């Protein structure tokens, strides 16, 4: 052992001490929490921690070098330390040079956690080839943290990041990302300025606000938390779904601020909803604009339905529109992720005028086609300027539906004759009326499409994905179907809003509309 200790001490002598080598290692590891105190040195006085054996200490810093050590007979020194002493040496240093390794020490490849860097150093001073970091730019940071392009970073943040951050080509842990976002200002109420109150509902109050990070307007949906009940289930649903829905035709959830008393959802701010847009047009919209809005509704729904998410509360008040004409689905408070097989859901889910007849008659098992009936009703309303089925009660709503589309029979709607609620109402035997008589501005292709939505049997309703390919949209051109999900249809030069014939204002007003708990709030 004396001979071994002497050889070990000679090996550890170099231009750098163990503390210096480990400090270099620490500089390249990901900082987990930006607000945490400085890490204590791993090694004190050049000795390994007493809780670890010499073998485990050496193995910690040499075991992941990827170059297997040469083996000597165990009788020379001993099996536990032979692998270390047998490694080739150049003078007093280990002859090891790190490449930009792609395999982490935990056995994972590029997906290795950002909390433990692959740039592991030997306790003896080892010069790394990639020690020098290139300067971090705003573009790097935006890409790294998925930030908005117009964000304003706090003064000095980039300089601090330059000193403390690991190389940007390494993976980043969720914990590190949260810490970085928090330091920038996300998740903090002081980042947002309340400008005015837009409205108040049962659980939430909505404010028009401004972000200090981007100087953009935002909608602050402040949900009150009751200590006895916690967050309303509608709020939990909305957050859990929206955080995973990233699409050009779905309202963007920018941030979540959680305090003891409230949960604030920070949304992008849009100027108005479809209901007010139609009101401003005097209920006479350009048929070209009707087509553009309908396509965007279908595009957003198709994205949701591919992910087994049902909106369940489609109505003009839940469709927000900005000055450019971009339409976005909003208010996912009643939305629900649909599992397979289909589960039973609440019977009270959709605003009465846009509720499909199967739900009105008590059906509680449904699929993505539940949303398509509402699409047909909204399509008609945009084209004609009036609601299709403005019933005041469930019976009145069904009466209006049957009077236009004909009272269903066992032939037109299998199973309806055995429905108890249908039998109890005892509706007159209405014959179907031609839809063109009620929506004369729709061409034959539009009538064909709306008929595909207004089917009694839910499984016969045209899915959103299929409807987008209908010949009715042929005039929009082929390129609109190839757009990435996050890209607006208005990025195409051939796609533009036209002036609506009945539009009463010469300029687009800033009205500030946002929807909470089925209550439309306007500034």
UniProtKB/Swiss-Prot annotation:
PROSITE patterns, A to Z = PROTEIN_KINASE_ATP, PROTEIN_KINASE_DOM, PROTEIN_KINASE_ST
Domain Protein kinase stretches: 192-473
A GO cellular component annotation here is: cytoplasm
Q: Which GO terms describe its molecular function?
A: ATP binding; cyclin-dependent protein serine/threonine kinase activity; protein serine kinase activity
**Which residue stretches does the UniProt record annotate as biased composition, category Polar residues?**
110-123
Residues binding ATP are 198-206, 221
* Gene Ontology BP, a term: regulation of cell cycle phase transition
Q: Name one Pfam family in it.
A: Pkinase
The positions flagged as active site in the entry are 313 (proton acceptor)
Q: Which UniProt keywords apply?
A: ATP-binding, Kinase, Nucleotide-binding, Phosphoprotein, Serine/threonine-protein kinase, Transferase
Q: Where is this region: Disordered?
A: 31-55, 103-123
**Family stated for the protein in its record:** Belongs to the protein kinase superfamily. CMGC Ser/Thr protein kinase family. CDC2/CDKX subfamily.
Q: What does this protein do?
A: May play a role in terminally differentiated neurons. Has a Ser/Thr-phosphorylating activity for histone H1.
What protein name does the entry list?
Cyclin-dependent kinase 17
Native organism:
Rattus norvegicus
**What taxonomic lineage is listed for the species of origin?**
Eukaryota, Metazoa, Chordata, Craniata, Vertebrata
